[in-house]
UniProtKB/Swiss-Prot annotation:
Region (G4): 136-139
A GO term, aspect molecular function: GTPase activity
GO cellular component: cytosol
Record protein name field: Elongation factor Tu 2
Gene field: tuf2
Domain of life: Bacteria
Region (G1) location: 19-26
Residue segments, region G5: 174-176
tr-type G domain residues: 10-206
Length: 396
């Protein structure tokens, strides 16, 4: 019998803690690294190190985010935790740290609070596929019935936001006790139970290369005697020489054949997610294709002009607008590689949006862009970023 090969290629999953301020998100993050470090599955990261998270820029927006990593027997996890409420909102909207699943932390002493709701709603809008709940501070509640009540309330709340409230795993425990007693079987049990829950309940993300082919067009050249080449970075999937591709967005969708793929002036058989390539397109004129369009597997993406989106508008101190905007606001929406002008309509009852706010809007673009729910964009005025958004629903 041949010896089984050691596999170091565990599936990689991105998770993050969300929930109301002071409910224990950062303590839980520290506790996970502390408890897992007893078995060599993480290196311990101190609460204060997570709390003074470094700032990073994503789509022109500064966000403080702490990253830790750990592994279970089955998976490798990258875990994000944000110090401030505004950082969470910015993070979820810009996708700075894309989450395959979220750990919602709720203090049993408080139950669901305003930010609990806001984070669940955002997770729904930005397309976080699954969530597990860690009921924290259970040691501070004497009455088990109270804890059960909090859990029932939360399951209903999850249902309200279209997460399957009955199926979502709930783990009861105390992050602080686990952090302080990582070797104590009883006190650390909640952390191991949480790991088991995320392992089994959060679905493994489909790898970029397994998704249908898509490449945003960054530049177009014509090569005499060979035809037209579109260059860009393959966002997802694989393009093989000889395959049909659709040119989508801005104009009517056109189908053509990719007759060559080159990278660093070498001819290849295929281009894969992450590669910067030039795709040679049969029978396409230089003026038929432009930046802002995408090459995609035919039938997998369509152009649209109207959509609903969740947006974060930069504050004045972040280099954003100094004044509010109103219904009918006309900024540019920067999708992938290009700016498109659009008109914003605000929800009923909202008169204006102040710098630093987050808001759900309907937007109408003047030219159609290849899009699907989950696509992120920047909101710009004359080349300056004033906000960020993510499409929550396509209208037409």
């Amino acid at each position: 019998m041949s010896k089984e090969k050691f596999e170091r290629t565990k599936p990689h999953v991105n998770v993050g803690t969300i929930g109301h301020i002071d409910h224990g998100k950062t303590t839980l993050t520290a506790a996970i690294t502390r408890v897992l470090s007893t078995k060599g599955q993480a290196s311990f990261t101190d609460f204060s190190d997570i709390d003074k998270a470094p700032e990073e820029k994503e789509r022109g927006i500064t966000i403080a985010t702490a990253h830790v990593e750990y592994e279970t027997v089955n998976r490798h996890y990258a875990h994000v935790d944000c110090p401030g409420h505004a950082d969470y909102i910015k993070n979820m909207i810009t996708g700075a740290a894309q989450m395959d699943g979220a750990i919602l932390v709720v203090a049993a002493t408080d139950g669901a609070m305003p930010q609990t709701r806001e984070h669940i709603l955002l997770a729904r809008q930005v397309g976080v596929p699954a969530m597990v709940v860690f009921l924290n501070k259970c040691d501070m509640v004497d009455d088990d019935e109270l804890i059960e009540l909090v859990e029932m309330e939360l399951r209903e709340l999850l249902d309200d936001y279209e997460f399957p409230g009955d199926d979502v795993p709930f783990i009861h425990g105390s992050a602080l006790l686990a952090l302080e007693n990582p070797e104590d079987e009883d006190k650390a049990a909640c952390i191991w139970a949480l790991m088991e829950a995320i392992d089994s309940y959060i679905p493994e993300p489909e790898r970029d290369v397994d998704q249908p082919f898509l490449m945003p067009v960054e530049d177009v050249f014509s090569i005499s005697g060979r035809g037209t080449v579109a260059t860009g970075r393959v966002e997802r999937g694989i393009i093989k020489v000889g395959e049909e591709v659709a040119i989508v967005g801005v104009k009517d969708t056109v189908k053509t054949t990719c007759t060559g793929v080159e990278m660093f002036r070498k001819l290849l058989d295929e281009g894969r997610a992450g590669d910067n390539i030039g795709a040679l397109l049969r029978g396409v004129k230089r003026e038929d294709i432009e930046r802002g369009q995408v090459l995609a597997k035919p039938g997998t993406i369509t152009p649209h002009t109207k959509f609903k989106a969740e947006c974060y508008i930069l504050g004045k101190d972040e280099g954003g607008r100094h004044t509010p905007f109103f219904n009918g606001y006309r900024p540019q929406f920067y999708f992938r590689t290009t700016d498109v002008t659009g008109v914003v309509s605000l929800p009923e009852g909202i008169e204006m949006v102040m710098p630093g706010d987050n808001v759900s809007v309907d937007a109408t673009l003047i030219t159609p862009i290849a899009m699907d729910a989950g696509l992120r964009f920047a909101i710009r005025e004359g080349g300056r970023t004033v906000g960020a958004g993510v499409i929550s629903e396509i209208i037409e």
